[in-house]
Amino acid sequence: YSQIKGQPRTEEGNFWHKQIYPNQVWLDGIYMAQPFYALYEKHFGDGDFSDTVGQIQTVRAKMFSKDKGLYFHGYDASRSAFWADPETGCSRNFWLRSLGWFAVALADLTEILPDGAGRDKLVPIFTELMASVGRYADPDTGLYWQVPDQGGRADNYLETSGSAMMAYAMLKGARLGLLEKGYAAKGQKTFHGIVEKYLSVTETGLNLGGICLVAGLGPENNRRRDGSYEYYISEPVVENDAKGVAPFVLAYTEVKRLRS
């Protein structure tokens, strides 16, 4: 909590992603900070969630593409990063796992925040994203593409971690009554699609494949991470990385709740 309170902020009031990424907001970082921040305020603070709500609203205002219904991976408030659009400050593409982190953060925050504490401002942002992202799912498997809006490209691939996050968010949203019941079926389809495509049993036990190892934007001395389509599909695809296994387990907990 002391780290959060001392974290540098952009001119709009959002936390920097990291010290080495000054003035930058990444979708990944919303999940890293905001659910914990809100839980701390709920149990140990004064119950003021306005900071969390305000930061989410800024992400919606600055990083949302109305044309695609998706959020760009990063935003540089200073417009000085080599990957940032000089007018909008946003990176140029959408990355599935960053969208997944944001979706999971929203799903969790809508459960954490009580009524009358800004929850009503987050719910429309969550439902809007779930409605728009669903149209990018692969119709056969229910999975989502590494670069979600470019699924027709031969070198793009169906990615596990972000797909599991979307499954979790849709299942949880339906359970909480924020989404129509049909979203539970969509979430189940995605989860079972992951099982069929990427979960295997070997001599060492269960193995989960199709996981993008890592992706980011910069810093200045790493210009390969430029937010291009070619960059996102160039990162290693691995098995059993925690960033894929953990969301898969989270999605499974929601599948189990649905069955109970």
Language-model segments: what does each one mean?
Residues E11, S65-G69, I112-R119, D138-Y144, ...:
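Surface-exposed helix-capping loop/turn segments at secondary-structure junctions
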Residues Y1-M32, H43:
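Extracytoplasmic mature domains of secreted/periplasmic and thylakoid-lumen proteins
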Residues Q34-D46, W101-G118, A164-L179, P247-R259:
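Well-ordered alpha-helical scaffold segments within catalytic/enzyme domains
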